[in-house]
């Protein structure tokens, strides 16, 4: 199956259907009385760059390591809080761009034959219904080649509706938060947004309406009244993250799209999208029962529903991560976020979440969609040099459990099971080697080799001997987001040489050697990397017969914890 379809409009944001071109996104509700599109642009974030590096961490690193080795959990926790937590504690967070309202006045109780769908083959949201004897259609796309969101409206002659553009979260009803102004002209609405916080990006969003020959567009206040049997709404947006003048950037994008009619816009969009989507096909059975997707999820046992889910994941990958000028990878919510205060900042969590986003990329033959991840990684490597040097006295670069649009690599928040974990960047670096294994792109590998090398420099300096002097281990360490009871029954979080750390370090040192071999590099770090890899501890089986999560056979505080980080190497 290649469609998600429903017989009712979305009741909230979670039920709306997503479109995206990697940078611009919208959630389409499909309502008949008042249609709503929740807009996002991937560089609309609260606040600008900030230096949050804990300045006294290195001074207290020996004490922290000693407390961890002595299993003095309270002292380790105290030192981590006062010397290793960043100030301010939070990185920047992602925000909505705005909301488009289209007031049709079609009361739901008088609507018949309602159908709403996301066509995964064409990356198009379609809404159709009958109202008072007339048939109404809307089609929505997010075009990558033309940098535009487009809404096509088909209706009986003389149909009238009102278009508004504002900055409103239906989720929180926070009208006009960080909204500078909205102004309408004869056929366009322009909105300026300052997301808030010091040195934040500024955004410009332009909505333009074009009608069929008999149609009219009338400005009333900051609204546009459209009267036509066919109309096309184009939406463009840029921010100061990519354009010094976002008004000019958005206007240029709009001007380019005006050179294409509806058919050309749709054809260009579909051709581009299908060049990626059509690379693979998964079918697990014949087409399942012809029932709406929400009902199918509840009642169907047809394996084809799994194939649909797989196709949807590929659709989301293509729609949320594309190459371009200062491209950003997909964040915790892809590019779709309705909240001015999203969960976990809707940023880039790198103790598993960002990596998970890209697990389908190479195996689904969508390696190009992974490239924005490496654009961010290059910037992280630059900012991470200070993190490595100031916090740990190490060469190279390091990043902790999260990052943001500005590639912030300092510890984030004040939650011990996640905050003090400087191997987030190392895990991301393994994607370099995996990407090359699929693509065999030597130019890419050459570009990213210095990033990988910097990561290896950090790891070689960060590793210390264990108490026996036999093995090299990490300290401080955690098993991300998990905690334990030690052999005395005391609760702890910080540890030495968690299993996931050792697995990541071993994989990175091995990948570094393989990359150097592919590039013909005789790097001076190679001998040190080989020696360190040979001195890493082996994996250990617990008395219960399980792979240990920690170097010592500790007991999980929460058995069956959602993070199974010690299975990383699998």
Segments predicted by a language model, with ranges:
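Acidic/histidine-rich catalytic neighborhood
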Residues: 454, 458-515
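A generic "alpha-helical surface" signal
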Residues: 304-307, 446, 450, 503
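Extended, hydrophobic alpha-helical segments in both membrane/secreted and soluble proteins
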Residues: 424-435, 444-461
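Aromatic-residue-lined binding/catalytic grooves and analogous aromatic/hydrophobic interfacial grooves
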Residues: 1-417, 423, 434-436, 453, ...
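Active-site phosphate/pyrophosphate-handling residues
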Residues: 355, 427, 503
């Amino acid at each position: 199956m290649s469609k998600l379809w429903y017989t009712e409009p979305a009741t909230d944001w979670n039920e709306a259907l997503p479109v995206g071109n990697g940078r611009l996104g919208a959630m389409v509700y499909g309502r008949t009385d008042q249609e709503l599109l929740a807009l996002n642009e991937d560089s609309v974030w609260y606040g600008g760059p900030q230096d949050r590096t804990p300045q006294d961490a290195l001074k207290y690193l020996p004490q922290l390591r000693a407390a961890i080795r002595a299993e003095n959990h309270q002292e380790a926790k105290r030192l981590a809080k006062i010397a290793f937590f960043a100030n301010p504690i939070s990185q920047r967070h992602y925000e909505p761009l705005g909301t488009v309202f289209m007031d049709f006045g079609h009361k739901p109780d008088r609507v018949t034959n309602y159908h709403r769908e996301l066509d995964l083959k064409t990356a198009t949201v379609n809404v159709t219904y009958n109202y008072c004897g007339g048939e109404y259609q809307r089609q929505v796309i997010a075009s990558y080649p033309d940098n535009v969101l487009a809404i096509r409206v088909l209706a009986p002659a003389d149909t009238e509706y009102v278009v508004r553009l504002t900055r409103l979260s239906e989720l929180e009803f926070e009208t006009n938060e960080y909204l500078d102004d909205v102004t309408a002209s004869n056929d366009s609405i322009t909105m300026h947004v300052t997301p808030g916080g010091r040195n934040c990006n500024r955004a410009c969003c332009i909505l333009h309406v074009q009608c069929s020959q008999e149609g009219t567009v009338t400005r009333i206040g900051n609204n546009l009244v459209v009267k036509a049997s066919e109309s096309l709404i184009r939406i463009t947006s840029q921010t100061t993250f990519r354009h010094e003048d976002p008004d000019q950037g958005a206007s240029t994008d709009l001007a380019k799209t005006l050179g294409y009619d509806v058919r050309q816009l749709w054809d260009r969009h579909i051709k581009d999208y299908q060049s990626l989507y059509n690379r693979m096909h998964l079918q697990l059975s014949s087409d399942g029962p012809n029932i709406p997707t929400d009902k199918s999820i509840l009642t169907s046992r047809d394996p084809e529903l799994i194939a649909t889910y797989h196709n949807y994941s590929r659709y989301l990958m293509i729609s949320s991560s594309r190459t371009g000028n200062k491209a950003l990878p997909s964040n915790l919510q892809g590019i779709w976020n309705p909240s001015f205060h999203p969960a976990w900042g809707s940023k880039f969590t790198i103790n598993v979440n960002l990596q998970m986003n890209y697990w389908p990329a190479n195996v689904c033959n969508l390696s190009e969609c992974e490239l924005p991840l490496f654009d961010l990684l290059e910037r992280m490597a630059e900012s991470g040099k200070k993190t490595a040097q100031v916090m740990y006295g190490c060469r190279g670069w390091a990043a902790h459990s999260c990052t943001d649009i500005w590639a912030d690599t300092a510890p984030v928040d004040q939650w011990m099971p996640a905050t003090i974990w400087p191997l987030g960047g190392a895990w991301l670096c393994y994607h370099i080697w995996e990407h090359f294994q699929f693509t065999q792109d030597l130019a890419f590998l050459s570009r990213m080799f210095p990033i990988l090398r910097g990561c290896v420099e950090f790891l070689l300096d960060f590793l210390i001997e264990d108490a026996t002097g036999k093995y090299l281990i990490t300290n401080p360490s955690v098993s991300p987001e998990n905690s334990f009871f030690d052999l005395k029954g005391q609760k702890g979080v910080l540890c030495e040489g968690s299993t996931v750390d050792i697995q990541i370090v071993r994989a990175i040192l091995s990948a570094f050697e393989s990359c150097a071999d592919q590039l013909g590099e005789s790097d001076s770090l190679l001998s040190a990397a080989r020696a360190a890899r040979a001195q890493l501890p082996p994996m250990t089986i617990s008395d219960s017969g399980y792979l240990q999560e920690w170097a010592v056979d500790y007991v999980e505080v929460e058995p069956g914890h959602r993070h199974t980080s010690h299975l990383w190497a699998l």
